[in-house]
Curated annotation (Swiss-Prot):
Highest taxon of the lineage: Eukaryota
Keyword terms, alphabetized: Amidation, Disulfide bond, Ion channel impairing toxin, Knottin, Secreted, Signal, Toxin
Localization: Secreted
SS bond list: 53-67, 60-72, 66-79
Record-linked Pfam families: Toxin_12 (PF07740)
Primary localisation category: secreted
Propeptide: 21-51
Modified residues (Phenylalanine amide): 85
Tissue-level expression: Expressed by the venom gland.
Name of this chain's protein: U22-theraphotoxin-Cg1a
Protein role: Probable ion channel inhibitor.
Comment block on domains: The presence of a 'disulfide through disulfide knot' structurally defines this protein as a knottin.
Record flagged with keyword Disulfide bond: yes
Length: 86
């Protein structure tokens, strides 16, 4: 019983490390592709437009990341409607 619990915890730890490194690799590839195809100046411009605002169900870390009338869901980190109208 103890061995299976330790084994399960070890597997989960390894999976989380693998996922984190895969995420970093994807971000690096995205940055390299932007630089190659758009040039450095255009890549910087593209990053600014990416940071403008996130639409409904877009990923976010704070309420400011989301567009108007949306807020960042505290548990799932995506933009949801805040219940207000224009």
């Amino acid at each position: 019983m103890k061995v299976s619990v330790v084994l399960a915890i070890t597997v989960l730890a390894l999976l989380s490390v693998a996922y984190a490194s895969e995420f970093e690799e994807k971000e690096l590839v995205k940055e390299v592709v932007r630089t190659i195809f758009l040039g450095k100046e255009d890549a910087a411009l593209r990053e600014e437009t990416d940071r403008e605002c996130k639409w409904y169900l877009g990923d976010c870390k704070a309420h400011e990341d989301c567009c108007e009338h949306l807020r960042c869901h505290s548990r799932w980190d995506w933009c949801i409607w805040d219940g207000t109208f224009g």
